[in-house]
Amino acid sequence: MKILYRLKNLKIKRSLRFFYQKLTRGWDDSETWNLEATLARHIVPRLKRFKELNNGYPQELTPEAWNEILDEMIFALEFRARDTEEQWDASTEEHTRVQKGLELFGKYWGHLWW
């Protein structure tokens, strides 16, 4: 019984600490447990909106090619944002596509503005 009480008490303390952290800095330490998924979840909706606004594309690309690249980035980040066992059970083709999307994200990082 004491163990259950301690666990419950620890959970309450942690929740309060995380609440205080969110109030004071806008995020809490739990977001660093799987920073990859946290960042992906943060980026995906913004990247989708960036694509919707369609305010240009890199000089060396066509608008169609740029949209395909953005789609690959979005696919990769959505896949990583899931943070579930299924992402580790995915096929080799999916992992290859995710890797390609992440590489494109890095390559075109400097073009994500308008």
Where are these regions (language model features)?
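Long, non-globular targeting/processing and low-complexity regions
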Residues: M1-W114
